[in-house]
Regions:
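Short, flexible turn/loop "capping" segments at secondary-structure junctions
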Residues: 74-75, 107-109, 167-170, 224-229
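Short, glycine-/Ser/Thr-/acidic-enriched flexible segments
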Residues: 88-90, 156, 180-182, 214, ...
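Short, well-ordered beta-strand elements within core beta-sheets of diverse protein domains
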Residues: 113-122, 172-180, 233-237
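A common structural junction motif
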Residues: 101-102, 193-201, 251-255
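PLP-dependent enzyme catalytic core of the Aspartate aminotransferase-like
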Residues: 6, 191, 207-255
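Conserved small-domain helix->loop->beta segment predominantly found in fold-type I
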Residues: 132-194, 198-203, 217-223
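Conserved PLP-enzyme active-site core in the AAT-like
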Residues: 1-144, 150, 156
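Short, solvent-exposed beta-strand edge segments and adjacent coil->beta transition regions
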Residues: 78-80, 170-174, 229-233
Length: 255
């Protein structure tokens, strides 16, 4: 990153941490330190962590963006987004663009997001606790069943130490897993869960499951952004963790 910034001026460095769907972790403070040295601002997509777990502005970021459709709304019934800034000049620019483009949420959608904020902390802590249990169980499965588990709460995750430092109270509710039997096994697996619903969204109280390569990330196949075909992304809800694990087990047993 520093090499790129030193050779050309950029207005922003964009960061998503944890990233979708491989949950890669970026050190926000270190990124901000380098970017600011070259007069570049840092914008962080904090959707996966939510403001309950991670505070990018406190770590040096200049702009934070959210899909409020996900954890902030939390009930799979609103579509929205938010931009959070820490200086008046940037706020005025964003407000002007919002007004000019008409990107203003309805009163009801705003009410739904405000309602979600009331329980955000409780929900995200339960999401995180359940996700850690699910990730640990998946990681304990034989290597001929589970190739790899991606979850920043696991010590095996390459970004675990950074995540533990900059995330507070949990590691989020998203777990990604690669099945050893390949892409068709991944599709068969998600077709046979009973509690997990096959759907593309995430962050609601109910558990969802999908195959990114065939669904959310199908459009980036063949590019540097493509994801493994055997990858399954799991949005772990707030149901009983033992029930969720039992559901995953019976679906794996059917492969």
């Amino acid at each position: 990153m520093e090499t790129a910034l030193a050779s050309k001026h950029y207005q922003y460095v964009w960061v998503e941490t944890p990233s979708n769907p491989l949950l890669n972790i970026t050190d926000i403070a270190a990124t901000a330190e380098v970017a600011h040295k070259y007069g570049t601002k840092v914008a962080v997509d904090n959707t996966f962590a939510s403001p309950a777990l991670q505070h990018p502005l406190a770590d040096g970021a200049d702009v934070v963006v959210y899909s409020t459709t996900k954890y902030i709304g939390g009930h799979s019934d609103v579509v929205g987004g938010a931009v959070v800034v820490n200086d008046e000049e940037t706020r005025e620019k964003v407000a002007f663009l919002q007004n000019a483009a008409g990107a203003v949420p309805s009163p009801f959608d705003s009410w739904l997001d405000i309602r979600g904020l009331k329980t955000l902390d409780l929900r995200v802590k339960r999401h995180s606790a359940n996700a850690l249990k699910v990730a640990e169980w998946l990681e304990s499965q034989p290597s001929d069943v589970i190739e790899r588990v991606w979850y920043p709460g696991l010590e095996s995750h390459p970004g675990h130490e950074i995540a533990a430092r900059q995330m507070h109270g949990g590691f989020g509710g998203i777990v990604s897993v690669q099945l050893a039997a390949g892409a068709e096994a991944a599709k068969h697996f998600v077709d046979h869960t009973q509690i997990f619903t096959l759907a593309e969204s995430l962050g609601g109280v109910e558990s969802l499951i999908e195959v990114p390569a065939a669904m959310t990330h199908a459009s980036v196949a063949g590019t540097t952004l493509q994801v493994p075909a055997n990858l399954v992304r799991i949005s772990v809800g707030i149901e009983n963790a033992d029930d969720l694990i039992a559901d995953l087990k019976q679906a794996l047993d059917r492969i």
